[in-house]
Amino acid sequence: MANPPFPLRSQVVTQGVQRSPNRAMLRAVGFRDEDFGKPIVGIANAHSTITPCNIGIQTLAERAEAALRAAGCMPQVFGTITISDGISMGTEGMKYSLVSREVIADSIETVVNGQSMDGLLAIGGCDKNMPGAMIAMARLNVPAIFVYGGTIKPGHYNGRDLTIVSAFEAVGEYSAGRISEDELLAVERHACPGAGSCGGMYTANTMSSAFEAMGMSLPYSSTMAAEDEEKAESAAQSAKVLAEAIQANIRPRDIITRQSIENAISVIMAVGGSTNAVLHFLAIAHAAEVPLTLDDFETIRARVPVLCDLKPSGRFVATDLHRAGGIPQVMKILLNHGLLHGDCLTISGQTIAEVLRDVPDEPSPDQEVIRPWHSPLYPQGHIAILKGNLAPEGAVAKISGVKTPKIAGPARVFNSEESCLQAILAGQIRPGDVVVIRYEGPKGGPGMREMLSPTSAIIGAGLGDSVGLITDGRFSGGTYGMVVGHVAPEAYVGGPIALVEEGDLITIDAPARLLHLHVSEEELARRRARWAPPEPRYKRGVLAKYAKLVSSSSLGAVTDLNLWD
């Protein structure tokens, strides 16, 4: 590539007599005389052997590195971390999951700015890799592209497709006596057949789909299987497109705008995506200095139908969506009905409308994954924002497809995920109960763990349609049922959820978007006078730092909000 028609950031380390020592170091990692005028591009490589989500990423990094060199750039590969949500789920380790989003963002920002890089190609697989990378891109605002590690293919057992959620639910089924130990083990052995992120429209696939919709990843790339050759080819193509974006000086904040975030949220609704996307897009918007609130999600939910029949509540997985036309097919339907901003810029330099020009107006009739406009799965989006005296700042719930959209019942109160799971597996939760899991919020956990173990146990025990669950923690993208998370303010800061007592009547009313505690204001005032914040669970280390800095979930659980106010 020709040198860009503007000074490169990397010139501060590659040009001039004073930078001779800097160049000496760069020569040791492969730079030649002719390379010092080329753009230096960081490859944030989240390869790891601790999780199937990331085990195939090294190949993608190598393909991207070669393509960047061929395009006239100087790639520099650096590592960033990952946490396996599926492996840490239900343990103390899960407290580090959301924390890892900030560590990933901070580490990428640190390397790219610390080394004065001219561009960034980030590759991620497990859930927090995606928002962590995008937060960094929004902060840095150097030309950047995201490459998804790819989705896992479904497992198969006894004539049905399996995902990791099948294994979590099998635990509840076994505990309730509905399956044998041999069947439990068979599900365990077949649920995860190879490399790739969890296969339904769970958090990883939700975020990758949203990034494609936003224009920060290439078309069709978010639903490719990790093990297929087209995934590696897309990594190389992403590198080529990034080199062109550097030449054209297309930056993340040219792409990450209010309108493109609305596009991403619209696609999240249309594909039936994860509630975690709410938390992550609030954080991405904060990093990009784009105004966004919980109420914006509710506004978009009301106008966008669910078009895709995908797990966890539906039938199909991401690879099925890919074969049916992928995210571009979903986007074309939304664009045709005025639900996308077609003039938004993408990393390729094209607008959304230009990218979608040759995509069919309607999905193929010989598939069942993507519904046509006139026959949606649900007429409105599934991620709702609930408010009420139990969640004055708001709470997040999946409401479409719930068989019991309104539950009023006695509170069953637990101050940790572990104590709740123990009660469920012991058969102590009854139909009509409203389970409350608190002190699991951003500060209180800390880290806002996902409650997949208790929710899966409820489903597995056959209580999914008759028991409600609310928490100041989060839910996995694999969760479904009458569950309400992200309750804010959280218990640790004295939110109303801290004042709930065993047996209090609670109403979860999805159609009314209401979360109500049937206790008088006078009684709540008496309880508040008696309440005192608990001792911090951690006083040193990363969890202590996180708990001290993190904001409310209603603001994205970010760690750099109003630091100097």
Swiss-Prot record:
Residues bearing PTM N6-carboxylysine: 128
Alphabetical list of SUPFAM superfamilies matching this protein: IlvD/EDD N-terminal domain-like, LeuD/IlvD-like
Source organism superkingdom: Bacteria
Keyword Transmembrane helix in record: no
Cofactor: [2Fe-2S] cluster; Mg(2+)
Gene3D superfamilies on file: IlvD/EDD C-terminal domain-like
Residues that coordinate or bind [2Fe-2S] cluster: 53, 126, 198
Pathway: Amino-acid biosynthesis; L-isoleucine biosynthesis; L-isoleucine from 2-oxobutanoate: step 3/4; Amino-acid biosynthesis; L-valine biosynthesis; L-valine from pyruvate: step 3/4
Any coiled-coil regions, as ranges: none
InterPro entries: DHAD_IlvD/Edd, Dihydro-acid_dehy_C, DihydroxyA_deHydtase, DiOHA_6PGluconate_deHydtase_CS, ILV_EDD_C, ILV_EDD_N, IlvD/EDD_N
Family from the record: Belongs to the IlvD/Edd family.
The protein's name in its UniProt record: Dihydroxy-acid dehydratase
Organism from which the protein derives: Synechococcus sp. (strain JA-3-3Ab)
